[in-house]
A protein has these predicted regions:
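A short helix-loop-beta-strand connector motif used in the catalytic cores of GNAT acetyltransferases and
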Residues: 54-71, 105
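Conserved GNAT acetyl-CoA-binding A-motif
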Residues: 125, 132-144
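Conserved beta-strand in the GNAT
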Residues: 72, 78-87, 105, 110
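Conserved GNAT-fold acetyl-CoA-binding loop/helix
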Residues: 34-58
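Conserved acyl-donor/pantetheine-binding loop and adjacent beta-alpha core of acyl/acetyltransferases
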Residues: 84, 89-104
C-alpha cells in the first residue's frame, strides 16, 4: 500500500490538522488498517467496528499529549494525506540505559492511494522532521509493521535504518 515516492510537479500543501478534515482522515486511516490486516501473516491485526469512529481521536490524543502535532497534505483543497508525530516521552529505564537524546516519533503516515508515488509522503515526513528539529530532537524514528515491505523501502529511501527488531513466537494454538 505504501510505495516509495517519486517527486513530480504537483502542488501539495501541508497544513496543521483541524477537525474539518476528520471524515477524510478517518477514512485514510481505515484504508491503512485494512491494508495491514490484509498483509498480516499471523492475522493478529484487525479492523474493529469502532476503529473508524475512535482511532483518529486516539492518534491525535497520543500526539498532542506528547508535545506532538498532526498534519494534512492537500491538493486543490482536497485532503490527500495525513501524518502525526510526537516527542518521545522518557521513562526511568531510558534514563538508566541511554544517553537520552530527544527523539521525534512518526506515529502515523498515510497517503491516499491515487497520490502515492507523487512525493506526498516524502513532503509530510520532511515537515515532521522540521518540526522535530524545532523541538531539539536529535533523531526521528518510526515503527514499521514487519510485513509492510513498501513502507520499509519508503523510509529506507529517506535515510531511515533499522535499530531494533521485535521478534515473536506463537505459544499456543
Amino acid at each position: 500500500m505504501n510505495r516509495p515516492e517519486e517527486s513530480v510537479s504537483v502542488e501539495i500543501q501541508i497544513d496543521d490538522y483541524d477537525a474539518s478534515h476528520e471524515k477524510k482522515v478517518a477514512l485514510l486511516l481505515c484504508e491503512l488498517q485494512s491494508y495491514l490486516v490484509d498483509i498480516d501473516p499471523e492475522k493478529i491485526q484487525l479492523l474493529s467496528d469502532d476503529y473508524r469512529s475512535n482511532y483518529l481521536a486516539h492518534a491525535l490524543r497520543l500526539a498532542y499529549t506528547n508535545h506532538g502535532f498532526a498534519l494534512i497534505a492537500k491538493s486543490n483543497e482536497k485532503v490527500i494525506g495525513f501524518a502525526a508525530g510526537m516527542i518521545e516521552p522518557k521513562d526511568e529505564e531510558d534514563k538508566l540505559t541511554n544517553r537520552c537524546p530527544v527523539r521525534g516519533i512518526i506515529s502515523e503516515l498515510i497517503v491516499a492511494p491515487e497520490w502515492r508515488g507523487k512525493g506526498v509522503g516524502k513532503k509530510l515526513v520532511e515537515v515532521l522532521e522540521c518540526r522535530f528539529k524545532e523541538e531539539n530532537c536529535e533523531y526521528s524514528v518510526v515503527d514499521v509493521f514487519g510485513p509492510n515491505n513498501a513502507a520499509q523501502s519508503f523510509y529506507s529511501g529517506l535515510g531511515y535504518g533499522s535499530r531494533n527488531i521485535e521478534m515473536m513466537k506463537k505459544l499456543y494454538g
